[in-house]
Amino acid sequence: MPRKMFSCDFETTTKLDDCRVWAYGYMEIGNLDNYKIGNSLDEFMQWVMEIQADLYFHNLKFDGAFIVNWLEHHGFKWSNEGLPNTYNTIISKMGQWYMIDICFGYKGKRKLHTVIYDSLKKLPFPVKKIAKDFQLPLLKGDIDYHAERPVGHEITPEEYEYIKNDIEIIARALDIQFKQGLDRMTAGSDSLKGFKDILSTKKFNKVFPKLSLPMDKEIRRAYRGGFTWLNDKYKEKEIGEGMVFDVNSLYPSQMYSRPLPYGAPIVFQGKYEKDEQYPLYIQRIRFEFELKEGYIPTIQIKKNPFFKGNEYLKNSGAEPVELYLTNVDLELIQEHYEMYNVEYIDGFKFREKTGLFKEFIDKWTYVKTHEKGAKKQLAKLMFDSLYGKFASNPDVTGKVPYLKEDGSLGFRVGDEEYKDPVYTPMGVFITAWARFTTITAAQACYDRIIYCDTDSIHLTGTEVPEIIKDIVDPKKLGYWAHESTFKRAKYLRQKTYIQDIYAKEVDGKLIECSPDEATTTKFSVKCAGMTDTIKKKVTFDNFRVGFSSTGKPKPVQVNGGVVLVDSVFTIK
């Protein structure tokens, strides 16, 4: 008999000296009439022991702290051996919570346990967005989180409705996922499983063989993220009119149309020599460099005390640098930089194939373009979650919770643990091609480029640039969508900028439009780490380095669980 599954949620107090759950709710996924809302954590945990089901909380990092704190205070201890009256967790080194598995004992050989998962890992959006995107017949409401609610507080009708809506939105969304066969712990795992189902596991293992951990570690040194760069010319200055374009599904579009690696790599010494059987390669290279006049810098060196990890470099400084580069990245560097004292050390070369992901992407593109609501959103999720799984870090050493003397949770690093890599070369080349796409477009607009962010280019002026004029479309895979046109803007640093975007009013809402159609502007604030509450305080006058405001909730572990304490956010 399949295990029952429930969507769950806690509402908690906001005081450091009185941290507790004042309301809980659970609803069975696939049977929405089976739900309960109550006001006692003890009562909820009693149900957890009896139900032996799979539970989903949206943001387990928060709610899970209350559960683990309760378990520790009630005689349960952490163990990964499945012993009675113990619990196991999957919490990453970075503090991401994936699972809590509570073992109550055994009936014969059958383990009596309840497993708690994070629905945020399967649906990585706020509840409000899920309700809207999935076109569910519910809306996430609002309550006063800071109201006084003493122990035994009687839940008001408004609070009851709020909690019920929250658990029902997630229950409905997960039910749709499960009925589509998306039953893994994360969206990325669902996506990888979907790809294997199309290719077949046997063929997958042949095309993408398991590499040794030492080889994976070396190849991983060529793995880099998106290209995010602000042109110094426009830094901290108010700019006039401009445009933003972004690539439709940047990473899937590279997977669809670019030559990508497969099979076991061949190690080579020295400089790569042309090999038609193995045309893709990663080159380990030591060199000095100087940016050419009129070119965008593309070299970023992380985990090096001599360089800022987020800075794109104009020169190599006093010493040569050593980098692992795909042939895609190396080609860009050779175009953008003068290279000196070059030493080609060694590398890996790969077979190539275009279209490995064609069937998978075609399948989900069809769903995305022909369906609405939930199925469309699931298609987008499947679409965007696959590339990252290939480069999953095999080091899965996690954190282990324990109870500190003050009754709060602490975390220590667990024993070293590794899993097999998936196929890191694929992630390395997909991201390299993505950077190539963005950088080559930006470089062709050198006299206009303000800013790049992974899949987007921000330009001065209101003319569509020549390099993309024939590939502008709001939906086509790999084409550039015209995101917006702004009247004025100010950029301070990567992922920190404001814009007055041309807009018009339609049915009481401001819709972005061309300058010719505009009747007003829409103020947009993009700032990593800044909450919506603080964004409401931002203006063109006060938006600068040093801007500071309260309104950023900071989680603090205390006796009982977690309290979100108001803290100060500063643009540095």
From Swiss-Prot:
Catalysed reaction equations from the record: DNA(n) + a 2'-deoxyribonucleoside 5'-triphosphate = DNA(n+1) + diphosphate
Annotated site residue numbers, Probably involved in nucleotide binding selection: 251, 380, 387
Residue(s) at site: Essential for 3'-5' exonucleolysis: 9, 11, 62, 119-120
GO BP: any one term: viral DNA genome replication
Site features described as Involved in binding template-primer structures, chain residue numbers: 90
Annotated positions for site Critical for 3'-5' exonucleolysis: 119
Domain remarks: The N-terminus contains the 3'-5' exonuclease activity and strand displacement ability. The C-terminus contains the protein-primed initiation, DNA polymerization and pyrophosphorolytic activities.
Assembly with partners or alone: Interacts with the primer terminal protein; this interaction allows the initiation of TP-primed DNA replication at both viral DNA ends. Interacts with DNA.
Protein name: DNA polymerase
Taxonomic source organism: Bacillus phage B103
Taxonomic lineage from the root: Viruses, Duplodnaviria, Heunggongvirae, Uroviricota, Caudoviricetes
